[in-house]
C-alpha cells in the first residue's frame, strides 16, 4: 500500500481513509485470520448448540431496557444497588421457566457484563441454595423449595459463614447452636462481637433466610461447625425476626451492587430439622451422627471455587479482547522516517506484554471445563448417595478430597491470573485504560475480592500444597491417589529426567518438564515432612514449617495442570482447521511459563542455560505467529460490544469515535463554569492581593 495514499474505502456504509483510520486497520487485521473463527467459538463453547444458546441469551439481555449499560460507570452505590435488585427480580423469572443449564448460561453471561448482579444472584443460588442442596437431605431440600427458595418467591437466601474475627479458619468460627432437648430446638447465639457474621452478601437489604455456619453443641459437647437454616426477616413486611440484628457494612472497594451486611443472633430458636442433616444428624433424644469426612459438610464451598475458575476465563477474555483490539488500531511513533506510525501490536515488546495473557485466558478455559466436569460428577454421586452405601461413601469421600485440593489451587491461581490480566491490559492501553468508560478500573475493583472470599488465595494455596504432600505420603505407603496427582507414581522415572536434545515444541516434553519440576518439589517437601515427624513434630507443626514448600508445590503443580489440560483438550477435541492455531497458543503458554520460572528448571536440572536461550527464542517466535491472528482469537470469544462495554475495544475498531461519543454523552456540555464557580473558584481567582502575597526578589 502506498503510504501517501489518501483515498477512501467504505466499511459498513461509512467512508474511511484507506490507511490512517482505525476501522480500516481493524478490517485488515480481521482478514488475516487463517482459521474458521466460528469453529473456534464452537470449540470454546463446547459445541454449536451451546454457542447458539449463548447468542440467543446475549441478544435477550442486550435488548432488555433494564440491562442498558450506557450510564453504568457513572452510577453511585445506591443507584447500583437498586438497579441490581431490579435485574435480579427480572432474572428470577427465567429461573421458573427455563432448564437449569440455560439458567447457568444466562448467569455466566451476566457475570461478564455486571458482576454485582451475578454475585447477588450467586449468593442465593450458588451459596444458600448450594448449601441446602449439598448438605441437606432430599426432604429438607424439597421443604425449602416449597417455601419459595427455588424461584425467589417470598424467599431470598444468603450465606452466613464469615465472622468479624474468623474467615479462613472455618473450624474456628464461634457462633453457637445449642440443642435444647426440652423444646426440640437449636438456640443460635453470637457470643461476642468478634463472632458477628460479617461480609454477608444479601444480608443488609434482601435476605429473608440464611444458612448459618455455627458450632453444634449437644449435651455440652462441641461437635464442630455445621450448617443451619435460620429465618432472618418476617415474610409479610420484611421486618427482622426476634433476636436478629442486621446492619449494612457500607462502602467497599467494589461490587456495590451487593448489599453486604453483618448479622448477630441473640437466643434465636429454630426447629431441630433446620440443621442440614445429609451428613451430620441429631435425633430427638440428642444423639449425634457425624460424617466420615468433615469436608462433606462443606461441599457448598467447592461450588464457588469451581465457578471462580470459569469466571476467571469469562472476565479475562473480555479484557484481553479490549487490549488486543486497541493494540491493532492504535499507532504510536514510526520506526522508519517519513512512514506512517506503527501499530503498537507490531512492537515485539507489546506482543510479549499481551499475547502470553491471551494464551493464559485460553488455558484457563480448558482447565475450568475439566474441573467443572469433575465437580458435576462428584455432586451427582453425593446427591445419589444412600445412607447405608459404605462403598459409595468411600468413593465420594475420595472424590471430594481430590476436588477440594484441585479446586483450591485452581481457584487461587486462576483468580490471581485474571486480576493480573485486568491490570496488565489496562496498562497496555495507556492513558485510555485509566478512563472509567473503558471498564478496567471498575472491573479490577469488582474482581479482586475473588482473591479473598470463599477462601483466601494464600490459605487455599497452602491447603493445596498440604494435600500434595499427603498424596505423596500415601503413594509411599502403597495407597491410591487421585488422577490429578497420578504423575507422581512415575516420580522415580522423572526425578532425574533432562531435556537431552529433545524438542521444546513437543507437548509431551513440555508437560514432562512441569511434571519433573512439580514432582521434585513435592517429593523433597515430603522428605522434609517425614523427617520433621520423625523429630517429634505433629502434622500441623510440620506443615507449618514447610509453608514455603507447600506454596511452591501448589504453584508448580497447578501450572502443570493448566498446561496438560490445554494440550489434552486440543488432542481430543480440536478439529483439524483449528488444531494448529490452538497449538500455537498452548506452546506459547507452556514456553512462556517456563521462561517466567526459568530458575526452577535450571535448579531441577531439566534444562541447561543454553536451553533457556532456546525457550526465549521460541516465545518470540510464537508471539510473532499468534500476533497475526489476534483478532480471530479474540473474535472467537464471541462477545458483542454490549458485553465488552469499552469504546476502545469495539468490534468495528472505530475506537476514537466511539470513545469521544461516550464521554460526551455521559458528560454533556453545559455552562462552562463548574457548579462551584461562585462559591469557590471565583473567590479564589479574584481574591484581593495582600502584602504577604507579594514575593520580593532580592536584587544583586
Swiss-Prot record:
Catalytic activity: a 2,3-saturated acyl-CoA + O2 = a (2E)-enoyl-CoA + H2O2
A GO CC term assigned to this protein in UniProt: peroxisome
Cofactor: FAD
InterPro entries xrefs: ACOX_C_alpha1, Acyl-CoA_ox_N, Acyl-CoA_Oxase/DH_mid-dom, Acyl-CoA_Oxase/DH_mid-dom_sf, Acyl-CoA_oxidase, Acyl-CoA_oxidase_C, AcylCo_DH-like_C, AcylCoA_DH/ox_N_sf
Principal subcellular localisation of the protein: other
UniProt-listed GO biological process terms: fatty acid beta-oxidation using acyl-CoA oxidase
Subunit structure: Heteropentamer composed of five different subunits.
Protein name listed in UniProt: Acyl-coenzyme A oxidase 2
Organism phylogeny: Eukaryota, Fungi, Dikarya, Ascomycota, Saccharomycotina
Amino acid at each position: 500500500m502506498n503510504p501517501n495514499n489518501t483515498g477512501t474505502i467504505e466499511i459498513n456504509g461509512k467512508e474511511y481513509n484507506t490507511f490512517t483510520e482505525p476501522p480500516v486497520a481493524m478490517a485488515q487485521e480481521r482478514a488475516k485470520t487463517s482459521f474458521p473463527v466460528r469453529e473456534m467459538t464452537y470449540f470454546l463453547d463446547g459445541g454449536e448448540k451451546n454457542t447458539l444458546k449463548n447468542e440467543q441469551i446475549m441478544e435477550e439481555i442486550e435488548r432488555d431496557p433494564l440491562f442498558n449499560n450506557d450510564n453504568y460507570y457513572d452510577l453511585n452505590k445506591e443507584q447500583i444497588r437498586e438497579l441490581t435488585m431490579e435485574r435480579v427480580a427480572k432474572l428470577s423469572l427465567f429461573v421458573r421457566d427455563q432448564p437449569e443449564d440455560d439458567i447457568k448460561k444466562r448467569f455466566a453471561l451476566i457475570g461478564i457484563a455486571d458482576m454485582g448482579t451475578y454475585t447477588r444472584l450467586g449468593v442465593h443460588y450458588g451459596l444458600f441454595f448450594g448449601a441446602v442442596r449439598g448438605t441437606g437431605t432430599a426432604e429438607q431440600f424439597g421443604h425449602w423449595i416449597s417455601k419459595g427458595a427455588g424461584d425467589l418467591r417470598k424467599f431470598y437466601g444468603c450465606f452466613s459463614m464469615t465472622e468479624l474475627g474468623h474467615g479462613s479458619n472455618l473450624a474456628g468460627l464461634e457462633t453457637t447452636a445449642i440443642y435444647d432437648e426440652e423444646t426440640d430446638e437449636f438456640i443460635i447465639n453470637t457470643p461476642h462481637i468478634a463472632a458477628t457474621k460479617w461480609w454477608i452478601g444479601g444480608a443488609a437489604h434482601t435476605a429473608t433466610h440464611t444458612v448459618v455456619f455455627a458450632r453444634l453443641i449437644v449435651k455440652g459437647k462441641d461437635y464442630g461447625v455445621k450448617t443451619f437454616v435460620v429465618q432472618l426477616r418476617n415474610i409479610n413486611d420484611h421486618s427482622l425476626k426476634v433476636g436478629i440484628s442486621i446492619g449494612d457494612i457500607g462502602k467497599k472497594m467494589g461490587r456495590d451492587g451487593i448489599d453486604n451486611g453483618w448479622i448477630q443472633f441473640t437466643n434465636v430458636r429454630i426447629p431441630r430439622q433446620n440443621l442440614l442433616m445429609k451428613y451430620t444428624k441429631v435425633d430427638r433424644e440428642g444423639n449425634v451422627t457425624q460424617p466420615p469426612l468433615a469436608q462433606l459438610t462443606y461441599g457448598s464451598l467447592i461450588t464457588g471455587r469451581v465457578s471462580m475458575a470459569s469466571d476467571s476465563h469469562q472476565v479475562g477474555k473480555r479484557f484481553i479482547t479490549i487490549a488486543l483490539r486497541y493494540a491493532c488500531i492504535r499507532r504510536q511513533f514510526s520506526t522508519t522516517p517519513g512512514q506512517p506510525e506503527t501499530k503498537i501490536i507490531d512492537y515485539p515488546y507489546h506482543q510479549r506484554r499481551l499475547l502470553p495473557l491471551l494464551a493464559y485466558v485460553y488455558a484457563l478455559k480448558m482447565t475450568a471445563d475439566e474441573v467443572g466436569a469433575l465437580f458435576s460428577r462428584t455432586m451427582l454421586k453425593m446427591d445419589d448417595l444412600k445412607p447405608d452405601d459404605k462403598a459409595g461413601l468411600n468413593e465420594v469421600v475420595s472424590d471430594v478430597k481430590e476436588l477440594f485440593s484441585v479446586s483450591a489451587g485452581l481457584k487461587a491461581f486462576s483468580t490471581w491470573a485474571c486480576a493480573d490480566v485486568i491490570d496488565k491490559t489496562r496498562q497496555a492501553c495507556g492513558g485510555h485504560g485509566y478512563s472509567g468508560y473503558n471498564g478496567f478500573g471498575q472491573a479490577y475493583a469488582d474482581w479482586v475480592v475473588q482473591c479473598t472470599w470463599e477462601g483466601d488465595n494464600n490459605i487455599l494455596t497452602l491447603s493445596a500444597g498440604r494435600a500434595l504432600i499427603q498424596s505423596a505420603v500415601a503413594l509411599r505407603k502403597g495407597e491410591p491417589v487421585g488422577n490429578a496427582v497420578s504423575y507422581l507414581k512415575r516420580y522415580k522415572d522423572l526425578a532425574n529426567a533432562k531435556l537431552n536434545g529433545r524438542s521444546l515444541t513437543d507437548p509431551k516434553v513440555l508437560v514432562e518438564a512441569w511434571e519433573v519440576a512439580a514432582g521434585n518439589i513435592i517429593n523433597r517437601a515430603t522428605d522434609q515432612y517425614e523427617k520433621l515427624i520423625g523429630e517429634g513434630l505433629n502434622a500441623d507443626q510440620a506443615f507449618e514449617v514447610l509453608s514455603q514448600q507447600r506454596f511452591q508445590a501448589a504453584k508448580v503443580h497447578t501450572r502443570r495442570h493448566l498446561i496438560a489440560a490445554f494440550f489434552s483438550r486440543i488432542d481430543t477435541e480440536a478439529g483439524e482447521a483449528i488444531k494448529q492455531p490452538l497449538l500455537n497458543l498452548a506452546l506459547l503458554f507452556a514456553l512462556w511459563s517456563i521462561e517466567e520460572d526459568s530458575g526452577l528448571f535450571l535448579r531441577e536440572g531439566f534444562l541447561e542455560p543454553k536451553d533457556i536461550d532456546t525457550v526465549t527464542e521460541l516465545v518470540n517466535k510464537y508471539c510473532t505467529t499468534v500476533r497475526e491472528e489476534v483478532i480471530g482469537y479474540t473474535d472467537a470469544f464471541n462477545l458483542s460490544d454490549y458485553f465488552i462495554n469499552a469504546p476502545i475495544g469495539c468490534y468495528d475498531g472505530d475506537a476514537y469515535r466511539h470513545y469521544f461519543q461516550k464521554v460526551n454523552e455521559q458528560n454533556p456540555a453545559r455552562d462552562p463554569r463548574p457548579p462551584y464557580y461562585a462559591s469557590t473558584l471565583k473567590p479564589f481567582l479574584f481574591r484581593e492581593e495582600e502584602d504577604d502575597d507579594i514575593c520580593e526578589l532580592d536584587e544583586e
